Amino acid sequence: MGPKGKKKGQSFDDSDEEINNKKGGNKKGQQLEDDIPQPVKKGGNKKGQRGKQDSDDEPENIPQPVAKKSNNKKGQRGKQDSDDEQDEIPQPQKKGGKPAPQPQKKGGKQQDSDDEQDEIPQPVKKGGKPAPQKKGGKQQQQQDSDDEQEEIPQPVKKGGKPAPQKKGGKQQDSDDEEDEIPQPVKKGGKPAPQKKGGKQQESEDEDEEDEVQQPVKKGGKNDKKKGVKHVEEEEEEEEEEEIEQPVKKGGKAPKPKKGGKGSKQESEDEEDDVQQPVKKGGKKDKKKGSKHVEEEEEEEEEEEIEQPVKKGSNKKDQKKGGKGKHVEEEEEEEEEEEIEQPVKKGSNKKDQKKGGKGKQQQESEDEEEEIQQPVKKGGKKDKKKGSKHVEEEEEEEEEEEEIEQPVKKGGKKDKKSSLEDSMSELSIKSKKGGKGKHVEEEEEQEQEEEEEKPKSKSNKKDKKKGKHVEEEEEEEEEEEEKPKSKSNKKDKKKGSKHIEEEEEEEEEEEEEEKEEEEEKKMTLAEIRAAKKVKKVDKKEKKKEKEKKKRDEQEEDAFELAKKKQQEEIDYDNIDIDDVPGKDAPTYVHLKSSEGLRSKIGNDIKFDNLILSVPGRILLNNASLTLAYGQKYGFVGRNGIGKSTLVKKIAMRDEITIAPHLRVLYVEQEVTGDDTTPLDCVLAADEERKWLLDEEKVLTELEKVNPSWQFDPRQKRNYSLRDIYDRLKEIDADKASIRAANILIGLGFTFEEISVKKSRDYSGGWRMRIALARALFCKPEVLLLDEPSNHLDLHACVWLEKYLNQWDRTLLVVSHEASFLNEVVDNIIYIHDQKLDQYRGNYDAFMKQKSVNLRSKEKEKDKQDRKLKKMNEFITKNKNNTQAKQAASRAKKMEKIETIELEREDASLVVDFPQPEHLTPPLLVFKDVCFGYEGRPTMFKKLDIGIDMDSKIALVGMNGVGKSTLMKLMNGDLHETTGYIERSRKMRVARFSQHFVDQLDTTMTPIEYFQSKFNNPPVQQIRNHLGRFGICNSLPLHKITTLSGGQKSRVILAELAWAEPHILLLDEPTNHLDIDAIEALAEGINAFTGGVVLISHNQHLINLIAEQIWVVKKDGTIYLYPGTFMDYKNEISREIDNMVIRS
């Protein structure tokens, strides 16, 4: 019967107020809700009560929303249908209406519904006997319906009785369509009886819920008689289903409806994946007509979507009413989504009663072990919400279709206890309920009181049931959030790494393009050499990348472990002995950590080291040990790998060095800023700075909390006494005096070190500041590369004296033999891709080397004589009777390793052309005074002279004017007063350390000479360059590709081109190795002209100087009466007098 006041197909807006106003109306015209439960006849039989218990056995698997009770008048419920957007609309039969019976043949139509009734059990009337089945047909139909009920739990009305199953076969279709539609029963309402043979239009909805689990009522007699023989076959078929369906937690299991057979089975495939929540309604809903049901079923045929039920959403807050047009549009949009939802594994299994339904329940539970079903929590508080929330819930459900929400497996014992409690309470309520109207009024009043309570409150029963479930769900949500946040961080890291890789690839492509352009200009030989260099570069880059990755991984692992350790410590509930405590930094040497350092060791050792640069290998399987406290001198020819190896040690690259060892490598000058040299040096000692800061912290803690040592948060693995001892050991109170002495020893004045800013110094002086910082820190390993290059003679002598007292590991790369003789006690000689170590200073090394060379020459001669005899025997007897012996000796000759002597390097040649002789004097200074304009006079009344046989060394502290005097000699500057007499035929050549930087590096040496000297013949240029070691293919190479020493040779060759009578050499040894310096000394001694030398290289001065001219600060020059070594000893005495005592 249609609703009053509403035409067919018409929809009305609904609201909570209208529903409340409609209570107490006539029951006959009441419209169906979206989820209308099947009425059940009220009886006193206990078998129906068992069915009710079965519906509560699985409350976590299928939530059931319950609608508010109201006394609706006839025709008023249709207005509410327009706002309800519920996907599931079960259809009841009219109360008291007799459906038209449909005949059924024996063994006939039940075959059509076999596949559709896989999982739907049939309820039995409470207190009544099960309906008998017709012969030949009804037995099989009942089995098919049982198959479909294995995954569809069916709730039972609260306080109501299960609906009976009428005779006849028309019930089959309704059961088929209840596969996925749980049907609740109204609380306390009277069930409407079903007539025999009545049609059920609800079959479409039931067919669409093919995979929702249905609990089965226990104890029905009819269940025992149902087809037991087919159970095993049905179980095998049901195990093949693999579609996961999420189910709300806390919802009560739906109850299958009963009714006659309908004709609409086409919607089974369409709604195979749709899960439909069902409301519980009052008993007035039972009177709704079947015509409106048919209209709603036609709308539901379009639904093909899995509708997950949101966790924690209200299941009972949907109001009664039919569907509106907007619901249909949303359903059409949702049909496109086909996302599988996770279903909870392992639902609660209870002991099943005997009978067919018990077997069906057992089969459905077996299949649940493969399907994880999230279950929704709920309570009575959910009943308040109305149809306005339906749209929000559907949107949330659509979002949840993209997210699988696994739920933990519930324990059987916990669920059993909670379900038994709930069933016992329900059974008590059902006994108290009667058939009269006063029962309905009492139930309505109870429901209204529950609606007035705040939503935050739930009934005690739900609290008891869901307490542990809620805790589990909160833990699960936190666990799900944690991996998401971690994955987001990993994604960010991966994204940043990917960007860096793309940038590197772009840079490589740009480099390749540039190289291709350069290759077009290069010859074949140069291209091949460049390709070899590229290969080596690629290998090195790969090694660097791998090293960076390893370092990053180690740092990340260390930081994570450290953070984890800090997070895990609960300082409030932990014993202080269990706290790891804070350690001092590795560069701080406290007594508390000396034991650990002694176990680790302070030596540096490496084996089988391979060192290479683009284009060639420097070291191959080299081994070396640097013992702590020893001082090593590193010698070898330029470009052989000395500086490269020192940098490798400083970077700890492929070389094992204990972490507590501080390694300092003085390579670059300090950056100029507003700090003074003294402050810059004091700030370099990190250990002293940390000790002073920690002393302040601990003394402050002592004042605030005298018992801080017992606070786990403040625990330290060292004491304040340890800090005091270390500060005393390093003379922290005398740090300023020590820093000042170092600066003064390196050439600074006491007045300027605390006033002048570092930015006001030149590069050479800032390099001295960097050296002073390293010496002040006193690292365990000090690495120096050509420390005397930027120092004057006085500073070199001071540095020698300072390093003589060095008690830690020292490795010095130096080309000054005198410095090595004074400082080191071991020599490491690099040659032929290997390292040889010698005990003693540089002179001892040279003696041992010469002895080894003579011994090797003798062995070489002996081997050559032996090989010559063997070769003569082979040649003589290869064709006679001793041919076999000759062949045997030939094989022996091939196995003999020939001894090879070190070849003399052709570049170790400096040959100045000899000038014609000129009568003296060539250059004479007579009462010469000089000073720059606006400055004080630098030189006063100079009376000096230079001839062709002069070999003079100018010495003095930096800044006294040695280079200025040399410019006056060359004529670059002119005297202020006095007179400089020069011979007219005299030619003078001056070498400056800055000339190397002024070379045109885009030219080859041959092109440079052609531009300087009016295009002389190429062969003449090559011959002249060969006299200074620029031979073979070097004259054809660009100057930019030459080493610093080779560039210096080009300058010397340029000076010698004019065949000068006097050579003025200002620091010519920079960039020259020891062998080249020796060659330069030999060339200068063989030169027949005059030589004036300015050099910090004591060995060169000692080899060539016949006169020592000392330039003093007062602008005078005097001839030192002794030798250079006598002058050096005098400098040493002066340095001792310069030391600040306090």
Swiss-Prot record:
Keywords in alphabetical order: ATP-binding, Nucleotide-binding, Repeat, Transport
Residues the record lists as binding ATP: 636-643, 956-963
Region (Disordered): 1-564
Domain of life: Eukaryota
Residue spans of biased composition, Basic residues class: 249-261, 280-290, 377-387, 456-467, 485-496, 530-548
Ranges of Acidic residues composition bias in the record: 203-212, 233-244, 295-306, 329-340, 392-404, 441-451, 471-480, 501-518
GO CC annotation terms, alphabetical: cytosol
Cystine crosslinks: none
SUPFAM superfamilies in alphabetical order: P-loop containing nucleoside triphosphate hydrolases (SSF52540)
Record Pfam families: ABC_tran, ABC_tran_Xtn
Molecular function as annotated in GO: ATP binding; ATP hydrolysis activity
Basic and acidic residues bias spans: 314-328
InterPro entries: AAA+_ATPase (IPR003593), ABC_tran_Xtn (IPR032781), ABC_transporter-like_ATP-bd (IPR003439), ABC_transporter-like_CS (IPR017871), ABCF_EF3_subfamily (IPR050611), P-loop_NTPase (IPR027417)
Biased composition (Low complexity): 121-143, 153-166, 182-195
CDD domains registered for this protein in UniProt: ABCF_EF-3
GO biological process: regulation of translational elongation; response to differentiation-inducing factor 1; sorocarp morphogenesis
Domain ABC transporter, chain residue ranges per copy: 604-857, 923-1139
Annotated family: Belongs to the ABC transporter superfamily.
Protein name (Swiss-Prot/TrEMBL): ABC transporter F family member 4
Biological source species: Dictyostelium discoideum (Social amoeba)
